[in-house]
Swiss-Prot record:
Induction field: Up-regulated 2 hours after addition of elicitor, with a peak after 4 hours. In roots inoculated with zoospores of P.parasitica (Ppm race 0), detected 1 day-post-inoculation. Up-regulated by ethylene and methyl jasmonate. Not induced systemically. Not induced by salicylic acid or by wounding.
Origin species: Nicotiana tabacum (Common tobacco)
GO cellular component, one term: cytosol
Gene (UniProt): DES1
Protein name in the entry: Divinyl ether synthase CYP74D3
Tissues where the protein occurs: Not detected in leaves, stems or roots of healthy plants.
Enzyme class: lyase
Main location: cytoplasm
Length: 478
């Protein structure tokens, strides 16, 4: 039995409930409900409520006509969801994006490691390469990120709040995150000094758009137009080829040490470049730009009482380190740490995990056992798993100190990284290679905020997944 799973021999076996409905028509109706009428959260909850089960058959968006394989079984509670982490049961080959997959031309003819199952010998080599590359650069994480938020975020926040009465936090993130990532992986080269100029984030967003939009709603067009354009057909790579080629050129010329490291591990430089770009685009750029708005939203909405606690904890820890922002100081900040975990629990950057059954197996929810047949396409919806009321008290509430003190025992139920928070990424698993980096950067974001400000207020505009956060006021540190 996998260490991920908690099983019981006393649960009754049930047939998997649910109904795929009429071919194509029912799937399109489900797609409209998922994207436009209900939204992702309500849609998944409605399926569980309708069939009184957290293991249920669904038509998974986007469905027709981007994919012919959209009849899935969904795992919607903490107990069933963790089966998605068991590499002996779940095949992750080409399932990262769900029921559709972008062509290999998006990645230079290669399949990045995220699309490769652990049973493929290439997986361990590529995952080890990424892990060792991060390890060799760990001393750069704090200084490079601090420089990036200082240069690209806070100066602009303050100016916009002063001049315009508010600042669009989300709009300022791409330049900051891209600059940090590029300097981290490209020997501290400033992206504006390369062929990319100031357009690096824009090239990256254009390349990412056709890969992500089939599973999202931009909410910028009438629903029927958006659905027709983006959920029925995959966008041809040719439309973004020039953007991708500029990114390849920039990283090929400036990520010299990372490419040298790849060659020493037996990985071709060309393959390494395309894996680096996937890491940069999907794992880091898209992930951080989804995570940070939720973090600032939750903290901003919590108000001045929490802000005072954070400011005191952060400034005290920094003072004890002689005024330096060090990893040692950050590790003393238990409230900051808990808030980052709580944000990742409530709003994981990647909410859906996909895979196909490698063999017949029994999956258990809290209430029953279900037979999964070999080849069945599966999806786990993480926000329901990590807000499972049978695991967490007040599961939908943002509780800043949830993971302080005895609360650290609940970290095994924080699942955002494609693994338990108590587990670590390794060459033989699919857990996010940047797990520890994301957590560090979340803490650093709060440290930088509350070294500068005593409190702030926010205005929130809901979007399909990440909210748009406007900073309304900033009260400088006293």
């Amino acid at each position: 039995m996998s260490s991920f799973l908690v099983s019981s021999n006393n649960l009754p076996e049930r047939e998997i409930p649910g109904d795929y409905g009429f071919p194509i028509i029912s799937a399109i109706k489900d797609r409209y409900d998922y994207f436009y009428k209900q939204g992702e959260d309500v849609w998944f909850h409605s399926k569980a409520e309708k069939y009184n089960s957290t293991v249920v058959k669904i038509n998974m968006a986007p469905g027709p006509f981007t994919s012919n394989d959209y009849k899935l079984v969904a795992f919607l509670d903490a107990n069933s969801f963790v089966y998605m982490f068991d590499n002996s049961l779940i095949d992750k080959t080409d399932t990262l994006g769900g029921t559709f997959k972008p062509g290999k031309e998006y990645y230079g003819g290669y399949r990045p490691v995220a699309f490769v199952d652990t049973s493929d010998p290439n997986h361990a080599a590529l995952k080890n390469y990424i892990l060792t590359s991060f390890a060799k650069r760990h001393n750069l994480f704090i200084p490079l990120f601090r420089n990036s938020v200082s240069d690209h975020l806070f100066q602009n926040l303050e100016k916009q709040v002063s001049d315009q009465g508010k600042s669009d936090f989300n709009a300022l993130l791409p330049n900051m995150t891209f600059g940090f990532i590029f300097r981290l992986l490209c020997d501290q080269t400033n992206p504006s000094d390369t062929v990319l100029g100031a357009q690096g984030p824009e090239h990256l967003r254009k390349w990412l758009f056709p890969q992500l939009i089939p599973s999202l709603s931009a909410r910028k067009l009438p629903s029927f137009i958006e659905d027709l354009l983006f959920h029925n057909f995959l966008i041809p790579f040719g439309l973004v080829k020039s953007d991708y080629n500029k990114l390849v050129d920039a990283f090929s010329k400036n990520a010299g040490s990372m490419l040298d490291e790849a060659e020493k591990l037996g990985i071709k430089r060309e393959e390494a470049v395309h894996n680096i770009l996937f890491l940069v685009g999907i794992n880091m750029f898209a992930g951080l730009n989804a995570f940070f708005p939720h973090l600032i939203r939750f903290v901003g909405e919590a108000g001045p009482t929490l802000h005072a606690r954070l400011a005191k904890e952060i400034r005290t820890a920094i003072k004890e380190e002689g005024g330096a922002v060090t990893l040692s100081a950050i590790n003393k900040m238990s409230l900051v740490e808990s808030i980052v975990y709580e944000t990742l629990r409530l709003r994981p950057p990647v909410p859906l995990q996909y895979g196909k059954a490698k063999k017949d197996f029994m999956v258990q929810s809290h209430d029953a056992s279900y037979m999964i047949k070999k080849g069945q396409f599966l999806v786990g919806y993480q926000p329901m798993a990590s807000r499972d009321p049978k695991i967490f008290d007040k599961p939908d509430d943002f509780i800043p100190d949830r993971f302080m003190g005895e609360g650290v025992k609940m970290l095994k139920h924080v699942l955002w990284s494609n693994g338990r928070e108590t587990e670590n990424p390794a060459p033989d698993n699919k857990q996010c290679a940047g797990k520890d980096l994301v957590h560090l950067l979340g803490r650093l974001m709060l440290v930088e905020f509350f070294l500068r400000y005593d409190t702030f207020t926010v205005e929130i505009t809901p979007l399909f997944r990440a909210p748009n956060v406007a900073i309304k006021t900033l009260t400088k540190a006293t």
